[in-house]
């Protein structure tokens, strides 16, 4: 009998059928990476609420499996939830120069200092645990975006 193939799980925690809260989990074997970590802004009827972040319950239950967060670009709907998530799950963050510059500013506002930022050039490939992540330059309304 042949070996049973290992499955890849793709789990969107936000950003599907909505604007904002972009966050996707890729799970393989016993490891996970997070793609983006965004927020959204409240609907008109959500009085008293300033921001909305994805539900990270699944991440908290599996935080030992998380190997890193990969950022595609520096818009709030892709990086805005980072300070809230990193207070509970501190893992390395991978992104391009401008993206990480915006992240650093956000962390200063939130008084976060014990973070590991890993700068990656567009076109580079990075090994993150079981994952091989290629940063492909992408055209977007903000410079230094990657897919």
Give the location of each predicted region.
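Short beta-strand scaffold segments in enzyme catalytic cores
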Residues: 21-26, 126, 146-147
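Divalent metal-coordination and catalytic microenvironments
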Residues: 10, 26, 36, 73-74, ...
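N-terminal Rossmann-fold NAD(P) dinucleotide-binding loop
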Residues: 78
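Extreme N-terminal flexible tails
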Residues: 8-12, 16, 20
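Extreme N-terminal starter segment of soluble prokaryotic enzymes
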Residues: 6-9, 32
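Pre-active-site segment of Zn-dependent metallo-hydrolases
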Residues: 18-21, 28-71, 84-91, 95, ...
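Metallo-beta-lactamase
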Residues: 2, 98-145
